[in-house]
Amino acid sequence: QAMGIKPRTEKKLAGYSSWYNRYQDITEDTIREDLTGCRSLLCPGDLFQIDDGWEPKVGDWLETDAQKFPHGLKGMVQEIHASGFQAGLWLAPFVCEKDSALFRQHPDWLLKADSKPWCCGSNWSSFYALDIDNPAVLDYLRRVFDRVLNDWGFDLVKLDFLYGAAPFGSAHE
């Protein structure tokens, strides 16, 4: 009050993330199961977030894992919205895994350290940083967010492993 800050009047965002229940073990069916369970627990407007495991490999953000999500994510978003929730999606936009299509097809998109792709960290496997100074990488990222937000219709993205865009040491080549 002394600073003249008004109390927050809007409800804080609450919701569900598939990560803590399923980790990467998600499919269309498990997401539907969780969505059914959340209908009695969450309030209209709350968030229902699909976390890691929807993508073929970390870094391959323009498509879904066809075995887990044979109908893609647009229909999942429609089901989430029909349940009264906002739809969220997990992304780690600045990194990729070594066995991703992105790593294989675009080695020139990777940040280098000592002339090799810079391994900037790991989760289940090593992550390699994208060179965000490369115009082709920036174009790719624009396409990723356009697809996720506009084509598939997600309302929110949870961004993870952002340190990939903050190189240090010899990764400044």
Residue ranges and their predicted role:
Residues P44-E173:
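Aromatic- and carboxylate-enriched substrate-binding clefts and catalytic-loop regions
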Residues Q1-D46:
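Carbohydrate-recognition beta-sandwich/jelly-roll modules
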